[in-house]
Amino acid sequence: MALLCYNRGCGQRFDPEANSDDACTYHPGVPVFHDALKGWSCCKRRTTDFSDFLSIVGCTKGRHNSEKPPEPVKPEVKTTEKKELSELKPKFQEHIIQAPKPVEAIKRPSPDEPMTNLELKISASLKQALDKLKLSSGSEEDKKEEDSDEIKIGTSCKNGGCSKTYQGLQSLEEVCVYHSGVPIFHEGMKYWSCCRRKTSDFNTFLAQEGCTRGKHVWTKKDAGKKVVPCRHDWHQTGGEVTISVYAKNSLPELSQVEANSTLLNVHIVFEGEKEFHQNVKLWGVIDVKRSYVTMTATKIEITMRKAEPMQWASLELPTTKKQEKQKDIAD
């Protein structure tokens, strides 16, 4: 009857009558597992794969062994009912250290909070530029020009998206192709509210043909302020988020930036007759009291202090599919 060999690394069945001094190839040592490496204490080979470890050929020859090794002896645990509970307690003093409570994330405030006008800081460069152009004082000459019905050759059409200029009486008869809505910049996409042809490229956005036909508007008194797009970008540090709007010669007395903890509304008047509007639903929460606006001759920087020092994934909070459906229904 064939018997099972219990030598480590063998595990074969053998005939006791044919058992010789070199019939078994086995490991006399013990398994060693260290730093993900597996091997036997009796030989140097090591491997990280357990199946490979099991297939390591023994390093010693001898007789097959049919005796099952004894199971490891479990330590005897003596209990006495007479011992009091105090005697069973450990003989050292216990120190229970309570872990600090985790820092709770700031709960997102309601978007319906009242809006506050951010402080405007006007740079010396902007003051000099406005004085030079006489835009801040509004001279009598400018007023007369605005009230005049005369249209100068080369005057640009005031309709949004129209790039035509006045070339004479024939321009009065031309059909103007323009955008009747306002430019919208949202989550990296740029489009007009009237036709919603979205693009991520600013130059492509500027080149979009209008969706409405009508008459050119050549004079300021007919057009009022002209809403135009402005290139803008943003960056952040650990504690602040800064938006840069590239609008030249902005007018502080006609511009305002208002915000609450999660919303930002930007209204900038620049170069006398141009307006830029942008409403932003902020990704994070800001400290309105510590936020401000810096106006220079070439751009406007909106510096918003973060309510908590964390990295924003984006400037704007993405809208949910439900909100997009509700907006499409409203439109």
Curated annotation (Swiss-Prot):
Residue ranges of region Interaction with PPP5C?
2-77
Looking at the record, the residues that make up the CS domain are: 227-316
One Pfam family per UniProt = CHORD
The PTM Phosphoserine maps to: 51
Q: In the UniProt record, does the keyword Plastid occur? A: no
The UniProt annotation places Zn(2+) 2 binding at 27, 42-43, 59
User: What positions does the entry give for Zn(2+) 3 binding?
Assistant: 157, 162, 176, 216
Q: What happens when the gene is disrupted?
A: Results in centrosome amplification and lethality. Cells become polyploid or undergo apoptosis. Embryos are no longer detected after 3.5 dpc.
Q: Which CDD domains does the record match to this protein?
A: p23_melusin_like (cd06488)
Q: Which GO terms describe its biological process?
A: chaperone-mediated protein folding; negative regulation of Rho-dependent protein serine/threonine kinase activity; regulation of cellular response to heat; regulation of centrosome duplication
Q: Indicate where the modification N-acetylalanine is found in the sequence.
A: 2
Q: Where does Zn(2+) 4 bind?
A: 179, 194-195, 211
Q: In which tissues is it expressed?
A: Ubiquitously expressed. Highly expressed in spleen, lung and brain (at protein level). Expressed in proliferating myoblasts and its expression remained steady after. Its expression undergoes diurnal and circadian changes in hypothalamus. Highly expressed during the dark-light transition (ZT20.5 (zeitgeber time 20.5) and ZT2.5).
Listed transmembrane segments:
none
Task: List the biased-composition ranges (Basic and acidic residues).
Answer: 64-82
Phosphothreonine PTM sites in chain numbering? 47
Which keywords does UniProt give here? Answer: Acetylation, Chaperone, Metal-binding, Phosphoprotein, Repeat, Stress response, Zinc
The record's section on Gene3D superfamilies has: 2.60.40.790, 4.10.1130.20
Give the superkingdom in one word.
Eukaryota
Where do the segments described as Interaction with HSP90AA1 and HSP90AB1 lie?
65-316
Alphabetical list of InterPro entries matching this protein: CHORD_dom, CHRD1, CS_dom, HSP20-like_chaperone
The residues listed in the UniProt record as binding Zn(2+) 1, with positions renumbered to this chain, are: 5, 10, 24, 64
**DNA-binding listed as a keyword:** no
User: Record's PANTHER family?
Assistant: CYSTEINE AND HISTIDINE-RICH DOMAIN-CONTAINING PROTEIN 1
Q: What is this protein called?
A: Cysteine and histidine-rich domain-containing protein 1
User: What organism is recorded for this protein?
Assistant: Mus musculus
The gene designation is Chordc1
